A protein has these predicted regions:
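Short helix-to-coil transition segments within interhelical loops
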Residues: 73-79
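Alpha-helix N-cap/helix-start motif at helix boundaries, enriched for small hydrophobics
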Residues: 81-83
Length: 219
């Protein structure tokens, strides 16, 4: 565990510039969504959380540019430890984005009032639902990156993320019953508990697969 913690610190240090740039972009997107929202700020939580879906692409692109994968290969760490550290890095950013989104939404609602939104949304419900969706997207991305590398999957992973988001919006418009179900989930505080649980389970399965596939790769 000590090695993984040190590796995680090295990850955060090596990708500090990328993480700062990502945080700035996420803040701008969330602020724009918040400014355009006339009702409650609760939906802005989902926007803040889902921006993390684009982080894995940036991390692995930086690995390729700076040859960090080569550096990690000569360090006294196993590939499994590197995989776990990368997953923990993304999880930490996701947790930070969730906390920031929730705090900003609560402060906004306290200052401006909850708004006149007609949807019965819960802060915990929206956050939990967004975390579950993010967990699935990130789990797929990381599995692809570790098994095939950024060069072979970079644009495909980015495109798949965009396609999933557009497909989700299309399904909501096409199937009203699905929309009602999602709104019901977003309005339940229990979703705030189940969502992170689903994300953790999916990421655990993805990490196990990534470890096996990454160990077989010829770097």
């Amino acid at each position: 565990m000590h090695v993984i913690c040190n590796l995680l610190r090295a990850e955060l240090s090596a990708h500090a510039t990328t993480l700062r740039s990502f945080a700035a972009v996420a803040a701008i997107i969330s602020a724009m969504n918040l400014a355009m929202s006339s009702g409650s700020a609760t939906p802005a939580i989902a926007v803040c959380i889902l921006t993390v879906a684009f982080l894995p692409t940036s991390l692995f692109a930086q690995d390729e540019r700076a040859h960090l994968d080569t550096m990690y290969s000569i360090l006294p760490v196993t590939r499994a430890q590197f995989v776990i550290a990368r997953y923990l890095c993304v999880v930490l950013v996701a947790v930070a984005a969730t906390l920031v989104g929730v705090v900003v939404a609560l402060i906004n609602d306290a200052v401006r009032g909850p708004g006149a939104g007609v949807l019965p949304l819960s802060v915990a419900g929206v956050a939990g639902l967004a975390v579950a969706v993010l967990g699935v997207i990130v789990a797929i991305q990381l599995l692809l990156f570790f098994s095939l590398g950024y060069t072979r999957t970079g644009m495909y992973a980015y495109g798949a993320t965009m396609a999933l988001m557009f497909a989700f919006g299309f399904l909501i418009k096409k199937f009203p019953d699905l929309t009602a179900t999602i709104i019901r989930w977003a309005g339940s505080a229990w979703t705030g508990v189940l969502g992170p649980g689903i994300a953790v389970a999916v990421l655990a399965v993805s990490a196990a697969g990534s470890v096996r596939l990454y160990q077989r790769r010829n770097l």
